């Protein structure tokens, strides 16, 4: 296993300049996703160790023998292999922030790739502890705690995005709605789309 070595932090301003062909709002969102959900050891590169830290946290929260832990082990291993096969340009078993942005900007948002759909489905199933096909605030909060979010942050975010077309709060979210918001989070340049706040309220 290759272990990521700490590298100099890349500022968001530098990333925006380097990837000037991408909307700055998307670059900011992509960097946030990379830092919060993939680069768990803050090395500015993603390796299998980052994914293992997520599995370990899932185990701590849900239990070693839980459905969530077994699902996380299986799904994250497959996701890592999939990401490496298409994003790891220099084949060093490390995915840098530039490789991550490069992967996303060459992805056709209209035809989501397998790794994207796998990640989208993994996150919903991880959160849906009761396996009833819908997600509520308590499940969302437990899932987000895997990534270090506290209850107040989760409550604010869930009430922000779990709404109907009239803006009224909806206490449970279906997979179809989750998928729409997940797509908005990754690819929408419209700052008013509620999917931008799917993994915590953003203020940029």
From Swiss-Prot:
Ca(2+) 1 binds at residues 39, 41, 43, 45, 50. Gene3D superfamilies: EF-hand. GO terms for molecular function: calcium ion binding. Residues 25-61, 75-110, 115-150 form the EF-hand domain. InterPro entries: EF-hand-dom_pair (IPR011992), EF_Hand_1_Ca_BS (IPR018247), EF_hand_dom (IPR002048). Ca(2+) 3 binds at residues 128, 130, 132, 139. SUPFAM superfamilies: EF-hand (SSF47473). Keywords: Calcium, Metal-binding, Repeat. Ca(2+) 2 binds at residues 88, 90, 92, 99. This is Calexcitin-1.
């Amino acid at each position: 296993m290759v272990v990521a070595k700490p590298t100099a932090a890349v500022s968001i301003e530098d990333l925006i300049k380097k990837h000037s062909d991408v909307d700055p709002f998307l670059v900011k969102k992509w960097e946030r996703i990379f830092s919060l959900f993939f680069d768990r050891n803050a090395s500015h590169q993603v390796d299998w160790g980052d994914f293992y830290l997520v599995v370990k946290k899932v185990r701590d929260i849900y239990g070693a023998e839980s459905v969530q832990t077994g699902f996380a082990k299986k799904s994250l291993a497959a996701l890592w292999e999939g990401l490496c096969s298409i994003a790891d340009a220099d084949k060093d078993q490390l995915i840098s922030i530039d490789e991550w942005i490069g992967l996303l900007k060459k992805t056709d948002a209209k035809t989501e790739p397998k790794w994207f759909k796998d990640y989208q489905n993994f996150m919903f199933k991880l959160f849906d502890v009761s396996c009833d096909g819908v997600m509520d605030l308590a499940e969302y909060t437990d899932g987000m705690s895997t990534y270090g979010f506290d209850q107040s942050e989760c409550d604010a975010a869930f009430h922000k995005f779990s709404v109907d077309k009239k803006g009224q709060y909806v206490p449970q979210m279906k997979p179809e709605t989750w998928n729409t918001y997940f797509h908005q989070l990754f690819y929408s340049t419209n700052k008013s789309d509620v999917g931008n706040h799917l993994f915590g309220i953003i203020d940029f």
